UniProtKB/Swiss-Prot annotation:
<keyword id="KW-0812">Transmembrane</keyword>
<keyword id="KW-0472">Membrane</keyword>
<feature type="transmembrane region" description="Helical">
    <location>
        <begin position="105"/>
        <end position="125"/>
    </location>
</feature>
<feature type="transmembrane region" description="Helical">
    <location>
        <begin position="34"/>
        <end position="54"/>
    </location>
</feature>
<dbReference type="GO" id="GO:0019867">
    <property type="term" value="C:outer membrane"/>
</dbReference>
<dbReference type="InterPro" id="IPR008436">
    <property type="entry name" value="CRPA"/>
</dbReference>
<protein>
    <recommendedName>
        <fullName>Sulfur-rich protein</fullName>
    </recommendedName>
</protein>
<feature type="transmembrane region" description="Helical">
    <location>
        <begin position="76"/>
        <end position="96"/>
    </location>
</feature>
<keyword id="KW-1133">Transmembrane helix</keyword>
<dbReference type="Pfam" id="PF05745">
    <property type="entry name" value="CRPA"/>
</dbReference>
Length: 196
């Protein structure tokens, strides 16, 4: 029914992905710091791909192979719900445009839609997690976490949205690299986007 090769997880044996996930959970529990463990997991695309591969073999493939999911009615319903979600999110952005500056709670709308889109493409469309997608995910998850922890966008994140710089911790809005002489240089990703 399922293959031993995980296209997203990148492991060659069927039992390696669940054992690796269990080892990660045990290491986090042994370290006593859930925050440090989650930061370690969310900072590596390889680890995220491993977790996505495990989730695909345990949850996504059985759902895809079910008769209900393969029915035309279910597929049309999911397509309509997805379109309604995107349209509702965009409509809320335009309707509450003036509120975005006054009330940061409305920033949850694009963050939630972006997270859903990234999860759907990674889990259902057989796309691997790249460093760029992981950085975008961390930014959006950072906005959600920052808004939901105390209701204020004040960079009080404990898990998502922080990168270590020379002496402080800041939100990873635009990745800036150092050229060794103290002059900030844009990352290759931002440079590539700027050229387009």
């Amino acid at each position: 029914m399922s293959s031993n090769l995980h296209p997203v997880g990148g492991t060659g044996t069927g039992a390696a992905a669940p054992e690796s996930v269990l080892n990660i959970v045990e290491e986090i529990a042994a370290s006593g710091s859930v925050t440090a463990g989650l930061q370690a997991i969310t900072s590596s695309p390889g680890m995220v791909n491993l977790l996505i591969g495990w989730a695909k073999t345990k949850f996504i493939q059985p759902i895809r192979e079910s008769k209900l999911f393969q029915s035309r009615a279910c597929q049309i319903t999911l397509l309509v719900l997805g379109i309604l979600l995107v349209v509702a999110g965009l409509a809320c952005m335009f309707i509450f445009h003036s509120q975005l500056g006054a009330n940061a709670f409305w920033l949850i709308i694009p963050a939630a839609i972006g997270l859903i889109k990234l999860l759907v493409t990674s889990l259902c469309f057989d796309e691997a997690c790249t460093s760029e997608k992981l950085m975008v995910f961390q930014k959006w998850a950072g906005v959600l976490e920052d808004q939901l922890d105390d209701g204020i966008l004040n960079n009080s994140n404990k898990i998502f949205g922080h990168v270590k710089t020379e002496g402080n911790t800041s939100r990873a809005t635009t990745p800036v690299l150092n050229d060794g002489r103290g002059t900030p240089v844009l990352s290759p990703l931002v440079s590539k986007i700027a050229r387009v």
